[in-house]
Regions:
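Surface-exposed peri-terminal alpha-helical interaction modules
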Residues: 1-121
């Protein structure tokens, strides 16, 4: 298992909106990796990192983030699930959009457009 202490230290230097923006970016990357059929071990590592980001942001006390973390951990425990790829792709994109919205950063409008496009594809 990797030592995430340095990564945590770096992640926690940013303010809460920026951390949520970084989390949203990682969730978007997960969605894209699943769609592109990136190596399963890489997807699992990314899910582990995302779960850590969510845990480290526990000080934000956002129940939604906790629920998302549980969902990501369930996916990670059972990955790869070939029949679940499209579902994880969509869920990660939805989570990314919601986390970006929670962050208050202006970029959430772009993520919203991307989500709407993917729902019609």
């Amino acid at each position: 298992m990797r030592d995430f202490s340095k990564r945590r230290e770096r992640y926690m230097r940013d303010n809460a909106p920026m951390r949520l923006g970084n989390l949203a970016s990682s969730l978007l990357r997960l969605s894209k990796w699943v769609k592109m059929k990136q190596r399963d071990d890489s997807v699992i590592d990314l899910m582990r990192e995302i779960a850590c980001f969510m845990e480290w942001d526990g000080d934000l006390s956002l129940v939604e983030i906790v629920d998302m973390q549980r969902e990501i951990c369930r996916w990670r425990r059972h990955w790869p699930i070939e029949s679940g790829r499209s579902e994880l792709e969509l869920r990660a994109l939805q989570m990314s959009n919601r986390v970006l919205e929670l962050s208050g950063l202006p970029e959430h409008r772009e993520a919203k457009k991307e989500l709407k496009k993917s729902e019609f594809v």
